[in-house]
Curated annotation (Swiss-Prot):
Classification via Gene3D superfamilies: 3.30.60.30
Entry's localization field: Secreted
GO cellular component labels: extracellular region
The keyword Ligase appears for this protein: no
Taxonomic source organism: Ruditapes philippinarum
Protein name per UniProt: Insoluble matrix shell protein 6
Length: 183
């Protein structure tokens, strides 16, 4: 009787072990997790049918949906441009004939020395163009892009064949079409 029970337990163990060995965790993930299709992408670039299947295979979630994952690029943030700076051009003329070396007259006529040829009191624009600040770069674990020619221009002025190729290089799209972007 004890031998029959031991053989029965051994047979049940073999059947259970043999029928469930499919996932990395040692279980039949399909039986355990079901067939619902809520796709998730793992950090290793594999698309799983649902989160349970992913966890059953000891993988970690990267995003919802099919692979590859794309994070939408954060908006480009610019620092404000400084105001236009006015630089008047005072000119002091000295008359070398005087002995005491004091200025004989002060003349506010435009001088042609050390200044660009801009009329007096015209604004001389001074801009400090900052580089774009990217907070988030698109994530590409496995770059497989189509050969479509939907040109995009990135913030660094490069034209790519399509947005997927730009994202593979970690570049954010500034506008559709070839560079330079028309405003």
């Amino acid at each position: 009787m004890k031998l029959e029970i031991a053989l029965l337990l051994l047979a049940v163990t073999v059947c259970v072990k043999g029928g469930f060995l499919q996932g990395r965790s040692g279980y039949d993930c399909r039986r355990r997790c079901g067939y619902d299709r809520r796709y998730v992408c793992s950090t290793d670039g594999t698309t799983y049918d649902n989160e349970c299947m992913m966890k059953c295979n000891w993988a970690y979630k990267s995003c919802d949906g099919r692979c590859p994952c794309y994070r939408s690029p954060a908006p480009v943030v610019y620092r404000p441009k400084p105001a236009v700076v006015y630089k008047p051009r005072p000119v002091v003329n000295y008359e070398p004939a005087s002995v005491n070396y004091e200025p004989a007259s002060v003349n506010y006529e435009p001088a042609a020395v050390d200044y660009p040829s801009v009329p007096d009191y015209e604004p001389i624009p001074v801009y400090n163009e900052p580089a774009p600040v990217y907070y988030d770069v698109p994530v590409q674990s496995d770059c497989v892009c189509s050969k479509d020619k939907d040109y995009v221009c990135t913030y660094d002025g490069e034209t790519y064949d399509n947005e997927c190729e730009a994202n593979c290089d970690g570049k954010a799209k500034m506008c559709d079409g070839q560079c330079p972007c028309s405003k």
